[in-house]
Amino acid sequence: MNMLVDGEWRTDAYETTDEEGAFDRQESAFRDWVEADPDAEFPAEAGRYHLYVSYACPWAHRTLITRALKGLEDAVSVSVVDPYREDEGWEFSPEREGCTADAVAGADYLRERYQTADPRFTGRVTVPVLWDTERDTIVNNESEEIMRMFDTAFDEYATRDVTFYPEGYRDAVDDAIDAIYEPVNNGVYRAGFAGTQAAYEEAVTELFDALDHWEDVLADQRYLAGPVLTEADVAMFVTLVRFDAVYHTHFKCNRR
């Protein structure tokens, strides 16, 4: 799989599976935080931060949903890459419907933004990316953390007085997000990219066991973490909404 190695684009540098054939997801590399504190390293400010996404990506989708539900469209701008990722990686294709140019720097490829943030970066070029236009760098490329920042750091600029990480349910939200990540959110990829039959069987079994579990949970309560809509529901939704169209066939998640 394609990636940057010491800042150079390589098309043969990343194996998607480990020695046992199991899908091996690289951890997100940029993990700074935007905070409501004006004295923070990355203080929340309207118009300062920019979000790079692909509509094809469930991880990016969850940040877009949180941004929209909070009413942050005017506070955090967005650029949308081409959903078809070729050998050159995520590309800006403004001529394609639903895609945009890079509104910050006019880059041709998302990897150029990674190279700006770290000229010696080694790793995969992924979405979403939260960009600081003032410091000209990546703040964060971990979707769960970007969701949390949008929900907790930008209230001053949100047009909707809602939270998806409510007091009194935070432990339940964190537990639900952790519980669905490996078997469901990442599980569809573990099935689709498995390099051995054993790795595939393990992934698809855990996936459908988890779906059965959460169906039982939702038989007794309205949402995953209790009576209110939270980040956990958004995280589950972006996988489920793609299940029939993509994962059932393309990723072989078709046990049922």
Where are these regions (language model features)?
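N-terminal regions that are enriched for targeting/export leaders
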Residues: 1-43, 47
